[in-house]
Amino acid sequence: MHIHIISVGKLKEKYLMQGIDEYKKRLSSYAKVDIIEVPDEKAPEHLSEQEMEQIKQREGERILAKIPNDAYVIALAIEGKMKSSEQFAASLDKLATYGKSKIAFIIGGSLGLSKQVMQRADEALSFSKMTFPHQLMRLILLEQIYRAFRINRGEPYHK
């Protein structure tokens, strides 16, 4: 399986980089993992609804340009479906069974994802009704992907 994590913004925090590197290393025996960063739009504090949509649109165009044509796309969004770790593992296993060898996870910027990105997504996944920093979400996502592979292989880890 080839996993693409497409995320808005550049990761700067060293402690997050270390965690991400650790999970990429752990995942290397299960899947190829690529993390693709697309530039975020600098935004002033007080934006109109129209300005927010324009920013999401520009970031969305960059995201869409990085999605492999044949990838199954999972957008991370608050309004997405919540799953337990076991349900998430089962859904990844099902995708593999149906020959979906490329999966692209999309993490938006601070304003979320554009309508176009959400339309391109095959599904929307929510980790919580809470909002997380998009940089931290990369680490959380990688940990859950790793956990899913361990669950699917019956290997100890997730309890």
From Swiss-Prot:
GO molecular function terms listed in the Swiss-Prot or TrEMBL record: rRNA (pseudouridine-N3-)-methyltransferase activity
Binding site for S-adenosyl-L-methionine: L76, G108, F127, S128, K129, M130, T131, F132
Localization: Cytoplasm
Statement: the UniProt record of this protein carries the keyword S-adenosyl-L-methionine: yes
Keyword Mitochondrion: no
Keywords of this entry: Cytoplasm, Methyltransferase, rRNA processing, S-adenosyl-L-methionine, Transferase
Catalytic activity entry: pseudouridine(1915) in 23S rRNA + S-adenosyl-L-methionine = N(3)-methylpseudouridine(1915) in 23S rRNA + S-adenosyl-L-homocysteine + H(+)
Gene3D superfamilies in the cross-refs: 3.40.1280.10
Enzyme class: transferase
Cellular component per GO, a single term: cytoplasm
Assigned EC number: 2.1.1.177
Principal cellular location given in the protein's record: cytoplasm
Pfam families hit by this protein: SPOUT_MTase (PF02590)
Subunit structure as annotated in this protein's UniProt entry: Homodimer.
UniProt family annotation: Belongs to the RNA methyltransferase RlmH family.
Role played: Specifically methylates the pseudouridine at position 1915 (m3Psi1915) in 23S rRNA.
Protein name: Ribosomal RNA large subunit methyltransferase H
Species of provenance: Geobacillus sp. (strain WCH70)
